[in-house]
Amino acid sequence: MSGFDRRSFLKASMVTAAATALAACASSERATGTTPKAAGKSVMGLVVPKMDEVRVGLIGVGERGIGFVHHFSRIEGARITAICDTDTLVLARAEKAINEYGRDKPAYFSKGDHAYRDLLNRDDVDIVVIATPWAWHHPMAKEAMLAGKHAFVEVPMAGTIEELWDLVDTAELTQRNCMMMENVCYGRDELMVLNMVRQGLFGELLHGEAAYIHELRWQMKEIDRKTGSWRTAYHAKYNGNLYPTHGLGPVAQYMNINRGDRLDYLTSVSSPSLGRAAYAKREFPADHQRNQLKYIGGDMNTSLIKTVKGRSIMVQHDTTTPRPYSRHNLIQGTNGVFAGFPNRIALENGGSGSYHEWDENMDAWYAKYDHPLWTRMGKEAEENGGHGGMDFLMCWRMIYCLRNGEALDQDVYDGAAWSAVFPLSVASVGDRGNSKDFPDFTRGVWQTAKPLGIVG
């Protein structure tokens, strides 16, 4: 048997064995909230063999994915070896960028919706970065792991509880990373607050507030290409929090969710759905497809989460109403509070002298509590861009961990728990706000897992 044939045989054998084991995990259990039997061992704190060079395959290089072309082309120890996108225009843009960096020419794939499978079959791809429309996140991440690759997927990780369990099971079975790339966890402010929390500045944590408040009605004008061409339909199909992780991810890390505490249940309600129909009526002809949709998603959704330890988290979603951008980023403890947008802090023994007034002068707080990772890499991150540097820092950290044999900062359990707010909020809104339980995606490991440390 030739080397190529042997590799193909082993890969096919792995996929067959994995499919058989995953089939044994009853889909009915995944869907109903019963914890399914594990198909493999936990990947909490998973460390994989060090990689001298991390060979990157990119699936999706459009509005979001083109940033990854730039970031991985600039990071030492990373090499883009394959790129796939069904849109030849954005593929050509990615090729132009690669050439400008003077990097080795990667393989390109663009023929059909499943061309990404040609990328997955390559032996020169170690990790697969998925930046595609949401519906493709689950199947692509699963197939990447079954092909022996580590999967790095854009937010949200998947759209249903069953899909989230499927990714957890696949990661455990294959012993591959499946990281949902929540970039906001790498923002300067979020890292600073994480540092503050770990140093006990706020005392015992009680409550957090998170949000994705970002007016995006203009995306409705993207009909055939770009994000609005597929994202708009979600507002006509679901009533809940469509996009919870940007705000929730950092707050969950502050609270050591999945590492000493976990999300227990949520209750969710939505406001009336008025803004998108009004926008469509104002901006499009009466017979336009945007005016044919029945928008059911409330303009503002508010979900309240209770953790097993009794803490509370408010998570809001609004991409429709005219208001300033916010992720809230609030964390309240027994000794004080930090709130973002704009940044401010109040402590019982804080610098302002009174917790009845906000201290909005953050310079001194940055000087004392800037996260060591930002202190080390912040200047380079800002120079390379991506939402103020958080995107570059996230990519740098991914490569650093893989090259140095360290566990990633986010794992499949984090991505599953944070993404679960979407389907659970939809279920709660549809049930008059009655509470819905979060699955324990860790299968109890959260009780003994080490807290996420301060990494530099």
Swiss-Prot record:
Residues 1-33 form the signal peptide. Predicted to be exported by the Tat system. The position of the signal peptide cleavage has not been experimentally proven. InterPro entries: Gfo/Idh/MocA-like_OxRdtase_N (IPR000683), Gfo/Idh/MocA_oxidrdct_glycsds (IPR050463), Glyco_hydro_109_C (IPR049303), NAD(P)-bd_dom_sf (IPR036291), TAT_signal (IPR006311), TAT_signal_bac_arc (IPR019546). Binds 1 NAD(+) per subunit. The NAD(+) cannot dissociate. Keywords: Glycosidase, Hydrolase, NAD, Signal. One of its GO terms (molecular function) is hydrolase activity, acting on glycosyl bonds. Pfam families: GFO_IDH_MocA (PF01408), Glyco_hydro_109_C (PF21252), TAT_signal (PF10518). Substrate binds at Y212, R231, Y243, P244, T245, H246, Y325. Its cofactor is NAD(+). PROSITE patterns: TAT. Its EC number is 3.2.1.-. NAD(+) binds at E63, R64, D85, W134, A135, W136, H137, E154, V155, N183, Y243. Glycosidase. Belongs to the Gfo/Idh/MocA family. Glycosyl hydrolase 109 subfamily. This is Glycosyl hydrolase family 109 protein 2.
